[in-house]
Amino acid sequence: MPKNPSQYILALDLGTTGNRAILFNHQGEIAGQSYQELTQYYPHPGWLEHDAIEIWQDTCNIIKKVLKTTNIDITAIAAIGLTVQRETCLLWDKTTGKPLHNAIVWQDRRTSSLCHQLKTEGKSVEITQKTGLIIDPYFSATKLTWLLEWVKANNPSVALKNVLAGTIDAWILWNLTGGQVHATDHSNASRTMLMNLDTRSWDRDLMDLFGIPERIMPEIRPSLSYFGETDPQLFGAKIPITAIFGDQQAALFAHGCNRPGLLKCTYGTGSFLIIQAGTQVMRSHHQLLSTVAWSTENSAYYALEGAIFTSGAAIQWLRDGLKIINNAAETETLSRQVTDTKGVYFVPALSGLGAPHWDMNARGAFFGITGGVGREHLVRAVLEAIAYQVKEVVDAINLESTLKVAALKVDGGASQNDFLMQFQADALGVPIERPLILDATAQGAAFGAGLTVGFWDDYDSLIASRIIDKIFEPGEDREQVQANFIPWQRAVERAKNWVH
């Protein structure tokens, strides 16, 4: 019998393109869910913002909606687990509860010049040594610098003593607790470029370097711990919040990657590969990131990560930008209509290139277009590029580690695409394992929250109960797929350093 009499765990998965609430029962099954798409704001080329008020209002709405549609009372929820898009950050006024500017999203490149300046000043080695990260606009530090300077210039009446800073988890936690708790967890803090990976605390030297007062930053706590409880005025009850993860780390937790060498890839807006590295920080020699996987009151687990900025975002661009598809599912049908791309290669550098290149001046491109190329060839080239980017990172991981990648666990929206998953298996030459529940980020947050309050007793048995939907084995096209990787790499080299 479970120790906790409540019947459900509520997972909040606050992502880049939308926000989701999912209820999990004692069997680890989804009992209900609700979703709200999130507005994207592009004020200038290369800039991307979210309205933090919209994220908070959506969070309240999706919680109320999932409870209403399932006819479940709030008191039946044992705990809340929160997982969020990482690096996206904001400043807000604690006296008004209002953001001082839109949140700056992880894909935003507005701080490229500041990052370039830091590199020319020789700060790369120090920052990587302290944080495990590579100087890039992707991370929160330069975004917070920009926001503080913007507030000083445009809203000088705001007193710094009233300003709070944080990633999306800190903002939502602060609101859920009625402004009582200003905290984050180690997995999110490790993505700011401000947390020392060895001490797992804010690094004073880096705070000074980026001009960020430590007092405005949230307290860092273990991922699996008691963060506070919901303000009863919000939903009618006090519900404990007992796990916070960055979205990719939550997926790693859901896949049961709790031993060194276990690897997962989430195909979302970007693709994110994380390999569990154990309880010691593992330093990369191949442009991968060292990061916190998750932490408990007693220990911390680390990981190596390859962050790819554009995967699902490229499919969204085909739909909304080029308007050559009506929906994401169409990409599979179109790709199967042709046997190859007719020599077309796509470089998905719509927000620069992440791992293993880290080139903020790269730009997206199609190469090899001739008169006989149709939209199906372009669409197939985009899917192939998503898989080839993952291969680049897996190759880097294999160079890095004594633990060679023997299989890849996958999740996220694009992992529903059977063509892409088979192509991925052929490109890597290893099996691809797709679970029945693809919402691994929400599942990981739920597992963490439930284990913390004793809703579930044992992590291993929880993982063992997960159902595998399909395993994609490398097929007869494997040799051709791997041969085409070489000209694709040539295309990538041509797209790099495009903007001078």
Swiss-Prot record:
Q: Does the keyword Transferase apply?
A: yes
Task: Give binding positions for ADP.
Answer: 16, 20, 269, 312, 413, 417
GO CC annotation: what is one? Answer: cytosol
Q: Which GO terms describe its molecular function?
A: ATP binding; glycerol kinase activity
The residues that hold glycerol are 86-87, 138, 247-248
**Superkingdom of origin:** Bacteria
Q: What is its EC number?
A: 2.7.1.30
Pfam families in UniProt: FGGY_C, FGGY_N
Instruction: Identify the SUPFAM superfamilies for this entry.
Output: Actin-like ATPase domain
Instruction: State what inhibits or activates this protein.
Output: Inhibited by fructose 1,6-bisphosphate (FBP).
An example GO biological process term is:
glycerol-3-phosphate metabolic process
Q: Which UniProt key words apply to this protein?
A: ATP-binding, Glycerol metabolism, Kinase, Nucleotide-binding, Transferase
Q: Which residues bind sn-glycerol 3-phosphate?
A: 16, 86-87, 138, 247
Known PROSITE patterns for this protein? FGGY_KINASES_2
Q: What reaction does this enzyme carry out catalytically?
A: glycerol + ATP = sn-glycerol 3-phosphate + ADP + H(+)
For whether the record's keyword set contains Manganese, the answer is no
Which pathway does it serve?
Answer: Polyol metabolism; glycerol degradation via glycerol kinase pathway; sn-glycerol 3-phosphate from glycerol: step 1/1
User: Briefly, what is this protein's role?
Assistant: Key enzyme in the regulation of glycerol uptake and metabolism. Catalyzes the phosphorylation of glycerol to yield sn-glycerol 3-phosphate.
Tell me the protein family, please.
Answer: Belongs to the FGGY kinase family.
State the name under which the record lists this protein: Glycerol kinase
What is the originating organism of this protein? Rippkaea orientalis (strain PCC 8801 / RF-1)
Q: Which gene encodes it?
A: glpK
